[in-house]
Amino acid sequence: MAHLGRLMVPLAALVLLLWAVPGAHGRRNNVRVLTDENWTSLLEGEWMIEFYAPWCPACQNLQPEWESFAEWGEDLEVKVAKVDVTEQTGLSGRFIITALPSIYHCKDGEFRRYVGPRTKKDFINFVSDKEWKNIEPISSWFGPSSVLMTMMSALFQLSVYIRTSHSYFVHDLGIPAWGSYLVFAFATVLSGLLLGLCMIFVADCLCPSKRRKPQQQYAKKTSPEFSQPLKKVEEEQEADEEDVSEEEAEDREGASKATSQSSIRQRCVGLPSATDTS
């Protein structure tokens, strides 16, 4: 029995030691992990999000404070999350992460960047005292859910895909670097041609070109408002034409009279000369 009692003492000490070690007894992790697939859950409720990288020393120093702050999440009615920018490049593009670690506060779809001290106490006061109201929210044009940031996210993901493909071509397939560049150049030209054809097809469907019809002469229909002035103008033109025709007729009559008188005079002058010769 004495020998058994001696064995129980070290065993009990070992159990207590393991229980005292953080995480050894299945400690719950209250920090949620966000990805490109589930990030839309940020648009509902109140959130505190940390953007970090495993290789960042400042991010490593922040982790204990962030996990301690996450334990107060249920009491503060705030959800605490983190994003690994090395794996979730799309999210880093949506938020335009330029420094690590970066912390954002989100309340019902409004995003604000946290710029205060990075301790558990400061995080708690920031949420409980609603200090986030003193910070101007990010414009909807540059919000993570905007069209512009969606395109930025796609651009970040495309850059990672190109880099991964280049590494696969060079290291796994043994293609020279210049050969990989030629592949990407050909793919770029081909995608540009396909995109141009698609745009032309869409434009033709939305705005079809009208076929030109042969021009036909149609009778002009005038409104009653302009019919009376037009009639007056036509009557004046007809009157002017009549005046001109009358003047021309008078001139012709005068000319004919003059010619007849001159011919009579010539005859009268010619008669005595004939008698004299007789």
Swiss-Prot record:
Residues bearing PTM Phosphoserine: 245, 278
Segments of skewed composition (Polar residues): 217-226
Signal peptide stretch: 1-26
Lipid-modified residues, S-palmitoyl cysteine kind: 205, 207
Cytoplasmic side: 203-278
Domain Thioredoxin: start-end pairs: 27-132
First-tier enzyme category under EC: isomerase
EC numbers on record: 5.3.4.1
GO biological process: negative regulation of platelet aggregation; negative regulation of triglyceride biosynthetic process; positive regulation of ERAD pathway; regulation of calcium ion transport; response to endoplasmic reticulum stress
Disulfide bond residue pairs: 56-59
Keywords attached to this entry: Disulfide bond, Electron transport, Endoplasmic reticulum, Isomerase, Lipoprotein, Membrane, Mitochondrion, Palmitate, Phosphoprotein, Redox-active center, Secreted, Signal, Transmembrane, Transmembrane helix, Transport
Membrane protein topology class: Single-pass type I membrane protein
Compositionally biased residues, Acidic residues: 235-251
TM helices/strands, residue ranges: 182-202
InterPro entries per the UniProt record, alphabetical: Thioredoxin-like_sf (IPR036249), Thioredoxin_CS (IPR017937), Thioredoxin_domain (IPR013766), TMX_domain-containing (IPR052454)
Chain spans, region Disordered: 217-278
Effect after changing residue 59 to A: Abolished protein disulfide isomerase activity
Domain of life, source organism: Eukaryota
A GO-annotated cellular component: endoplasmic reticulum membrane
Main location: endoplasmic reticulum
Purpose: Thiredoxin domain-containing protein that participates in various redox reactions through the reversible oxidation of its active center dithiol to a disulfide and catalyze dithiol-disulfide exchange reactions. Acts as a key inhibitor of the alternative triglyceride biosynthesis pathway by inhibiting the activity of TMEM68/DIESL at the endoplasmic reticulum, thereby restricting accumulation of triacylglycerol. The alternative triglyceride biosynthesis pathway mediates formation of triacylglycerol from diacylglycerol and membrane phospholipids.
Name of this protein: Thioredoxin-related transmembrane protein 1
